[in-house]
């Protein structure tokens, strides 16, 4: 899994605008969020089975 910054898109938080990041796993976007959210997702999913991680991709579409 790798975290990739999307330079042309941003996320509006309560007090500021931050760049959008995505987590890519096996050429599939499995999570969209801020950089800390994406790193947290990678941390919690590092020992999860591949099928479970790819199932997350279906939830964001």
Segments from the language model and where they lie:
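Beta-strand-connecting loop/turn residues
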Residues: 19, 27-28
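A short, charged, amphipathic alpha-helix used as a generic interaction element across diverse proteins
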Residues: 24-25, 31-56
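Short N-terminal "domain-start" leader segments
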Residues: 1-22, 47, 51-61
């Amino acid at each position: 899994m790798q975290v990739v910054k999307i330079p042309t898109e941003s996320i509006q938080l309560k007090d500021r605008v931050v760049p959008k990041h995505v987590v890519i796993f096996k050429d599939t976007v499995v999570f969209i969020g801020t950089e800390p959210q994406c790193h947290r997702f990678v941390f919690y999913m590092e020992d999860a089975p591949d099928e479970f991680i790819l199932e997350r991709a279906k939830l964001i579409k």
